[in-house]
Structures are given as C-alpha cells and as structure tokens.
Amino acid sequence: MGTEPQLKLYNTLTREKVDFQPIDRENVRLYVCGPTVYDFAHIGNARPAIVFDVLFRLLRQVYGENHVTYARNITDVDDKINARALRDHPGLPLNEAIRLVTEKTETQYYQDTTALGCLEPTVQPRATDNIAQMIEIIEKLIARGHAYQAAGEVLFDTKSMADYGQLSKRNLDEQQAGARIAVDAHKKSPGDFVLWKLSAENEPGWESPWGRGRPGWHIECSAMSGRYLGDVFDIHGGGLDLIFPHHENEIAQSRCAHGTDVMANVWMHNGFLQVEGRKMSKSEGNFVTIYELLQTEKLGGRTWPGAVLRLAMLMTHYREPIDFSVKRLEEAERLLAKWPAADIGNAKPDATVLVALADDLNTVVAIQALHALAQAANADASILPVFAASAALLGLLPEKVEMDDAVASEIDARVRARLELLKAKNFAEADKIRDTLLAEGIQLKDGKDPATGERITTWEVKR
C-alpha cells in the first residue's frame, strides 16, 4: 500500500502536527475511550464515535484492513451506574439492577453507532472483564513506589512521577495552589487519585489484596489498552474533556507501572459540541440523545437519518467546536440528496479525498472534494465507483452487498429460530446457529426494542 499519502496527525502531547509512523506497520493500534453505560449516549458522544471511525477507516485504507487493531472500551462499573440502577429498579438486588441498566444501555449504544455508519471496533472490552488486569497494575504501582493505601483506598502518588502533567500542561504546584476545596486528609497531595476503593456490602465489588472493592475510573482504561494493545501503542483518542484528569492519569498509571517513556505515541482529541448556540444540558432543555435524534421528533420536530447526523458532524474539522443545529442537519441532508447511489466494485478512493483525510482528518476539504466528485459522477457514470469508494472512506456510503431474496429469507428464518431457542433458554443450540452464520460471513447483533423491551436480532454481511 506504498502509494498512500503520508499521514499527519495533531498530537495533543506535543501540541503539533506530526508525521505518523506506526510502531508496527503490520499491526497499527488505536484506543478510544468508549461510553459509561448508565444512560443513552447523547449527540456529543456521537462525535468521537464518528471521528475515530473515520480514522479507523483511513488507517485500514493505508495499512490494510487486517493490519489495524481498534479498541474501544465499555465502562460498566461506575458509581453513576449504581445510582441509575437504584433509581430505575429500586425493588431489585443492586447487582441485578446494574445488569439490566448496563445491558440495555450497551445494546442501545451499539444500535446507535451502527445507525451512524460506524464500523465495529476490533475489540470492545468491558471493564468488568478486566478486573484482574487492573489489580495487577495497581500491585506494580505499589511495588514501584507510585501508589499507597490510605483510608480504605489505594491512591496514585502524583508526586512520585517527576513529569506528571505533560499532556494537560498542568503541574502539581498549580493544582495545589488552585485547589478550591479542602484536600482529603488521607491524601498525600491534592492531585492524588483513586486506583481502588472498598465497596459496601450491597455495592458491586471484587476480591483484591486490599479488600473487596472496585476500581477507580482511570485504571480501567490503562488495563484494557495494555491488555489488547500493549504497554506502548500508536494512537489514543477521545474528547477534549478527557485530557484532564482522565487521560493525564491514564498516562501516569501506565508509564509508571510499565516503566515506559510514553503510553501512546499520538494523543488525539475532538472538540466540544453545543446545541443551537448553547451548551447542551438537561437544564437548558436542549439535551438530545442519539436515539432521540434518530427515532423521535425532539430536534426540529422530525426524525433524522444516521447518515445526515454523520455528515453534519464531519462538516466541521474534528478539533474545532461544533454548533449543532437543525439548520446544520438540513444543510447536510440537502448535500446528501445530491449524491448518487453507486457500487464500489474494485475502485480506490479519489486521491484528493485521501490526501485531505491524511492531513489530520481534514473532513471539511474531503467533503468538498467528495461533492465535486458527486457532481462529476452525475454527469459521467464511469466516475461512480471512485465516488462510492471515496464516500465509503468517510462512512457515508455503506458498501452494497447484492443478495438473492431467497438467501436473505433463509437467513431471516435461522435468526427467528435462534430467537425461539433463546426464549426457551436453549443457549447451546442458539450459539450453534450464531457461530454457523458467522462462519458464513453473517454478523448477528442482539438488542432490545427500547419501546417494548423485547429481544430483537438484526444481521448484516460482515465488512
């Protein structure tokens, strides 16, 4: 793939645009902070999902589809989840209530991101499946003098790391001088943060050398990125709001545990989003979830297709703030209406589109080039495949897969049979159907109808 352009990415760590050089061209590794599954994702959460999906597509284009590993985590242990579970299911044991909340929210997130045209990440680890890895990192930090026990908690000792604060450009003296609240008496320094805390009897918890407890927020991502991508990997992404304290503390934990100079070589952050000129908040009445935008008339008195939301996001450079509005959605919809339907065939993306995206994901220029290509394709059908390949690189033209109606009907019948087996709790036979379909290139996605709570299953030809 040597003819592809040189990727240039803005690195928050160095505050400059750099030539991207992967550690291993055979396995380019990307980690993005995913959702905390206590509530449906809002349209601000849609932005990193879309932005880093474009990066994932671009990396696959440059290095090959089988040479990129994209990990996006699911945070399914958090005090916000506990609070939501108690609120929504007061009559149930807390662990059962938590399971209902996290399953419903995670399923909806997958449905939302699929509707937005996002490819499925290579791995989507859950925090609760990686507790052992978190405990192992904490043990290393204690052994190396970077963490301590106090008042039922294990805390990271920020003063033990000489260059703590590199990502956010904050130093410990500034944090101490700027503290507005009294420092917890058990902390050595104001910036020290929780790695592990004890759980009450009714709270979720796991056995550890420090007692039955649960992890702090930051340690979760250090454990999952390390497990699936290694001690040092290529790119770490997320929203600007995560730079401090979350990403700063991830770096501190990972570097001090593994003895490395960096955690990730490049740190990328997407800008903030506001709605109709105001910060999005429930108190302002302009808080909108992805589900509400796609399925209800909450914004603009109508529903909006996922492709329209995606294009509306990409019409602004990812590092710039977005003012999300009905006007912007209408503009994106008008633009999409002018683009022809087309099959990719064996075509490659247009060089102008590819070069724009290689320049720090310049989707603004890429979309301008794509629109010019669409106009040319409307006049000359021979250009259609190149337009389609270029649009697919932005996730704006899903690949069409021709399938005989009889074959599709047969797949539908097997999916329905599996649902009946699941209802009968015959999980072994249900899994056989799922695995057979997967071997045939058919990916199943289980979910629940938000309105009825009934189990639903959709399928697609695996990309």
Swiss-Prot record:
Cofactor note: Binds 1 zinc ion per subunit.
Motif ('HIGH' region): 35-45
Enzyme class: ligase
CC terms in the record's Gene Ontology section: cytosol
Localization (cell): Cytoplasm
Motif ('KMSKS' region): 279-283
The keyword Ligase belongs to this UniProt entry's keyword annotation: yes
Keywords: Aminoacyl-tRNA synthetase, ATP-binding, Cytoplasm, Ligase, Metal-binding, Nucleotide-binding, Protein biosynthesis, Zinc
EC assignment: 6.1.1.16
Obligatory cofactor(s): Zn(2+)
GO MF annotation: an example: ATP binding
UniProt: Zn(2+) binding residues: 33, 221, 246, 250
Keyword Methyltransferase: no
Binding site for ATP: 282
Catalytic activity annotation: tRNA(Cys) + L-cysteine + ATP = L-cysteinyl-tRNA(Cys) + AMP + diphosphate
InterPro entries: Cys-tRNA-ligase, Cys-tRNA/MSH_ligase, Rossmann-like_a/b/a_fold, tRNA-synt_1_cat_dom, tRNAsynth_Ia_anticodon-bd
Chief location category: cytoplasm
Alphabetical list of Pfam families matching this protein: tRNA-synt_1e (PF01406)
GO aspect biological process, one term: cysteinyl-tRNA aminoacylation
NCBIfam families, A to Z: cysS
Entry's family note: Belongs to the class-I aminoacyl-tRNA synthetase family.
Description of how the protein assembles with itself and partners: Monomer.
Database matches in PANTHER family: CYSTEINE--TRNA LIGASE, CYTOPLASMIC (PTHR10890:SF3), CYSTEINYL-TRNA SYNTHETASE (PTHR10890)
The protein's name: Cysteine--tRNA ligase
Record gene name: cysS
